Amino acid sequence: MKATKGRNVVVVGTQWGDEGKGKLVDWLTESAQGVVRFQGGHNAGHTLVINGVKTALHLIPSGIMRPGVKCYIGNGVVLSAAKLFEEIEGLEKAGVQVRDRLRVSEACPLILPFHSALDVAREAAREQGGTEKIGTTGRGIGPAYEDKIARRALRVQDLKYPERFATKLRELLALHNHILVNVLGSKNFTFGDALKPYIKDGEVQFDAVYEEAMRHAELLKPMMADVSRELNAAHAEGANLLFEGAQGTLLDVDHGTYPYVTSSNCVAGNAAAGSGVGPGMLHYILGITKAYCTRVGGGPFPTELDWEKEGTPGWHMSTVGAEKGVTTGRSRRCGWFDAALLKRSAQVNGLSGLCITKLDVLDGLQELLLCVGYELDGEKIDLLPMGADEIARCKPIYESIPGWTDSTVGVTDYDKLPANARRYLERIEEVTGVPIAMVSTSPDRDHTILMQNPYAAQ
C-alpha cells in the first residue's frame, strides 16, 4: 500500500526578524519528522527555552532540540563550517545528539574568512565616508551570497576535492584581497580577534584559510547530503516537514526595506528554492509576528517609539521584552504593532495563519496603539510602500485600544486571556485579514495558545 504523503509547514517572520520563530518551530516539531533551514546563515539567531533552560541557535534548525527529529541545512543557506562546528560542540556538551541527525546540502556556498573581512571593511568604509551603515552582522553573509550569484563561490561539495578547492580559493583570494587592500584600504583597519589569525598586512592568507577548510572537510563529510533528494523521499514516505525561515519578510532582499535588508529571500516562496522541493509541497504558511514591532540596525521604522526613555511604552517593550539581538547583542528598536506592514507580509508570503508572540510583554500598559495605515505625502494608504524612502516619509495612522493589567504569562487557553487582550488580537485579525492560529505567552515551549494546528488545518 502506498504511503500517504506528509504535510509540510513553512514558518516565516513577518517583521524585521526576532519575532520568536525558534520557539514556535520547536513547538511545531512535535508534529514533524524533519526541520529545514532554507536561507540565511549564522547571522540569524533563534532562542529556545525548554524547561527553563535557554538555548541559542544560529545555523542548526531548531528541531535539533527534539530527539529523533532530522535536521537539514538546505542549498539556500550560506555556511560557515567554523560556526557550524562551534554550535555542534556546544549542543553536544549539553547532551544533544547532532551529527547523526544533521544533513548539510552539498550545494551550500561556504562563508570563509575573507567574506567576513569584506563585510567588516565595507561597513567601516561606509562609516568613514559619512554614509549610514547597512547594519550587517559583519559575519560575511552578503559577500558569500555575492560570490554565489557571480558563480564563483566555493561550495560544500568542493571540500571533497582538495586540489580543486585550492585552485578556486587562490582565484577568490586574488580578487577579494585586491578589493580589501586597494578599494577598501584594509591595511589601515584593525580587524577583530576572530579575523586576526587569517590576515597579514590587510590581506587574507591562503594557508590559514585552506588548512582550516581541510580540517572542516573531514568533519563535514559524514553530514554532506543531497538534501533535495532526501526531503522529497521523506515527503513521499509520509513524513511531515517543517521549513524554518530566518530573519523576517521586511529584511527580504526583494520585498524588504531595501537597501536596509539581508542578502537572501526570507519569504515563504524561497522555502522551495532554498531546499530543493517543489512549491506544491508547501501546504501551510505560518507567519510569526510580535505583539509589537522591533528592528535591529538602520532603516525606516514607521511606528518606532523612544525606547530608551524610562517609563515610556517603548522602554517597557525594550526592558520587559529583553530586546537584544541573539546574534549581535545589539539593542533592538521598539515600536507599536504595524498592521499595514503585516498586510504587506501577508501578501508576499501568502499567509495561512498568524502566530502572535510576546503578548505577555504588553501586560501593564494602559493604552495600546495599533497602526492601521499611513499618511504619505498627504494621501492615506493602508499598505506598507515598497521603497525605503517612501516608508521613511510615512506617518502612522493609529487606533487606540485599552490595555490590561492582568498577567497573560503562561496562559494556554484563549478564553482565559484578559478581555482587552482578546480585543487587541481580534482587531489585528480584522485589519490584516489573516486568522490567528497561535499565541505565545512566554518564551517557554509550553506557554502557547493553540487555535488552529497548522499540521491539522485543511
Curated annotation (Swiss-Prot):
The keyword Metal-binding applies. Binds 1 Mg(2+) ion per subunit. One of its GO terms (molecular function) is GTP binding. InterPro entries: Adenylosuccin_syn_GTP-bd (IPR018220), Adenylosuccin_syn_Lys_AS (IPR033128), Adenylosuccinate_synth_dom1 (IPR042109), Adenylosuccinate_synth_dom2 (IPR042110), Adenylosuccinate_synth_dom3 (IPR042111), Adenylosuccinate_synthetase (IPR001114), P-loop_NTPase (IPR027417). It catalyses: IMP + L-aspartate + GTP = N(6)-(1,2-dicarboxyethyl)-AMP + GDP + phosphate + 2 H(+). Transmembrane segments: none annotated. Mg(2+) binds at D18, G45. It holds the Pfam family Adenylsucc_synt. SMART domains: Adenylsucc_synt (SM00788). Substrate binds at V326, T327, T328, G329, R330, S331, R332. It is found in: Cytoplasm. Pathway: Purine metabolism; AMP biosynthesis via de novo pathway; AMP from IMP: step 1/2. Disulfide bonds: none annotated. PROSITE patterns: ADENYLOSUCCIN_SYN_1 (PS01266), ADENYLOSUCCIN_SYN_2 (PS00513). The active site is at D18 (proton acceptor), H46 (proton donor). It comes from the Bacteria. Keywords: Cytoplasm, GTP-binding, Ligase, Magnesium, Metal-binding, Nucleotide-binding, Purine biosynthesis. Its cofactor is Mg(2+). Its EC number is 6.3.4.4. Homodimer. Plays an important role in the de novo pathway of purine nucleotide biosynthesis. Catalyzes the first committed step in the biosynthesis of AMP from IMP. NCBIfam families: PRK01117.1, purA. Belongs to the adenylosuccinate synthetase family. This is Adenylosuccinate synthetase. It comes from Delftia acidovorans (strain DSM 14801 / SPH-1).
